[in-house]
Amino acid sequence: MSIIVALDAKSQYDALSIADQLDPSLCRVKVGKELFTHDGPQTVRILQDRGFELFLDLKFHDIPNTTAQAVCAAADLGVWMVNVHASGGRKMMETCVERLKAGNYRTQLIAVTVLTSMGREDLRDIGLDVEPFEQVKRLAQLTQESGLDGVVCSAQEAKMLRDLLGTEFALVTPGIRPEGANADDQKRIVTPKQAMLDGSTHLVIGRPITKSERPNEMLKQILSSLA
């Protein structure tokens, strides 16, 4: 079990201001689209120099060759983990896995199933008349069959996926909120302890830590709750 702190900051300065209050031996960090688009690979390198393993959360989704090139570019940065959209399909995901193996990269590759902000009506709007957990199940199985290391999923689906996919498949879970925290824009949320019990291997936690007056103390409290 590990905690990934989401550095959902607008600038490198803001991200580093948070990271400098965290102990890299206690967590990994996640860099997403806004921060990476604003400041690029430099922010990744600085965080790595500070001792953090990094999850580059860019959710690549394109034709197979283009997606694989982007994944390998992320691996060239030395990131610990990168992700793609499982809805890009089997060929796209398999091509990414093949390229990473050919390059002897150690970067873990996972796939996004259904965004945690999406409910049944949101899926219906894009032509998928299914419950979110059914689509998660379908895409998670496809991801495993394609050779990836794991999926991003809601903790509410984690137990079902753990039973379905076995013990070696990573389940990376956003929408984690400690007891009493605001749900913000996440529709499918759960506490850290419950997520761990349900089979999640990595917990993505943002605002409850990054907006805390003492981020590292909040991180320690969450880790203690998992003991």
Curated annotation (Swiss-Prot):
| Enzyme active site | 59 (proton donor)
Biological or metabolic pathway of the protein: Pyrimidine metabolism; UMP biosynthesis via de novo pathway; UMP from orotate: step 2/2
Q: Which SMART domains match?
A: OMPdecase (SM00934)
Q: Which Pfam families match?
A: OMPdecase (PF00215)
Instruction: Return one GO MF term.
Output: orotidine-5'-phosphate decarboxylase activity
| Catalytic reactions of this protein | orotidine 5'-phosphate + H(+) = UMP + CO2
Q: Which GO terms describe its cellular component?
A: cytosol
Gene3D superfamilies xref list: Aldolase class I
* Superkingdom of this protein's organism: Bacteria
Instruction: Output one GO BP term.
Output: 'de novo' pyrimidine nucleobase biosynthetic process
- For this protein, the Enzyme Commission number is 4.1.1.23
Binding residues annotated for substrate, in chain numbering: 8, 30, 57-66, 116, 177, 186, 206-207
Q: Which UniProt keywords apply?
A: Decarboxylase, Lyase, Pyrimidine biosynthesis
The record's section on InterPro entries has: Aldolase_TIM (IPR013785), OMPdecase (IPR014732), OMPdecase_AS (IPR018089), OMPdecase_bac (IPR047596), OMPdeCOase_dom (IPR001754), RibuloseP-bd_barrel (IPR011060)
Subunit and interaction comment: Homodimer.
Q: Which NCBIfam families match?
A: PRK00230.1, pyrF
> What is its biological role?
Catalyzes the decarboxylation of orotidine 5'-monophosphate (OMP) to uridine 5'-monophosphate (UMP).
Q: Which family does it belong to?
A: Belongs to the OMP decarboxylase family. Type 1 subfamily.
Stated name of the protein: Orotidine 5'-phosphate decarboxylase
Q: Which organism is it from?
A: Acinetobacter baylyi (strain ATCC 33305 / BD413 / ADP1)
